[in-house]
Amino acid sequence: MSIIKTLSVGNGDMFYIKHGSDNFTIIDCNLIDELQEQIVEEIINEKKGKTITRFISTHPDEDHIHGLKYLDEKIDILNFYCVENEAIKEELTDDFENYCKLRDGEYHYYVYKNCKRKWMNINGDNRGSSGINFLWPITSNESYIDALDKAKRGESYNNLSPIFTYSLNGGITAMWMGDIENNFMEKVKDDIDWVEVDVLFAPHHGRESGKVPSDVLEKINPKIIIIGEAPSEHLNYYNGYNTLTQNSTGNIAFKNEQSKTEIYVEKGDYPYDKSFLKNEGICDCKLGAYIGTLMLEDK
């Protein structure tokens, strides 16, 4: 059993995965001031008993690293995963400086397509892996090299984002894309070995600017798309696909078991379609308000 949680942190991203193995993964960081202590306390409590904690940074935009210095001070990040880059910023913040310290420091690991690492996707020393696999970047790709150059000049960072999945044996596969932009994905989509997923966290918080191309959606065939907390006028609602909109759910927790995933939300009065979920009449109240179960019998 594992837990994926997408935290409601305003116009930004933050997730964690409490693996069934001896692993705990944090993805991005947007510790808005009023929730900073509460979220970090939750992370500290949830990762108790896990020997390995990793932080995956998709890219260094402020809404993905805000509060990173505070988090690092509280949990001491010893496994920092990011793409290899030389991003700079004209206006330095404490969090970007902390990002650079971790990116360039002793405990970084640079991710790329099909990278292998013990306990990330390789078992070892009687400890299971995390089930995390990277589909992108291909570091020799010309469009990606151009994105690296733009970050090195301090112009933009979104297209540094890796694409990766988390899979539970016999259960869920979820995909993250950071803030990859639509026009960039159109250039590189044919170079990526797409896999089918159950849950897609829409890139760029669900914005139209991050819309996943239709032919890519057909290949990954998501059962649910999670749309983030960008302003509603900027969102693409992925018509024709089952969605949960985090502006209306608040936090979302996925309790993953073989052949099914129970879904819990912060706001129990979620007003939109949930008919794609099976109501099993169960409740794990500490995770939130139960809204249904995504059945995965084909696993």
Model segments located where?
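Core dinuclear metal-dependent hydrolase active-site scaffold
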Residues: 1-50, 112-196, 253-299
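Hydrophobic/aromatic beta-strand patches that form the interior of the parallel beta-sheet core
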Residues: 5-7, 25, 56, 81, ...
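Active-site metal-binding motif and surrounding structural segment of the metallo-beta-lactamase
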Residues: 23-25, 34-87, 191-207, 218-225
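Active-site-proximal beta-strand/loop segments in catalytic clefts of secreted hydrolases
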Residues: 28-30, 57-60, 83-85, 113-115, ...
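Short, flexible/disordered intra-domain loops and linkers
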Residues: 34-35, 87-97, 150
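Residues at alpha-helix caps and immediate loop-helix transition turns in enzyme cores, especially N-
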Residues: 36-39, 67, 92-95, 212-213
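A metal-dependent hydrolase metal-coordination microenvironment
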Residues: 62-63, 97-125
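Internal alpha/beta domain cores that form substrate/cofactor-binding pockets in large enzymes
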Residues: 63, 90-92, 105-107, 185-191, ...
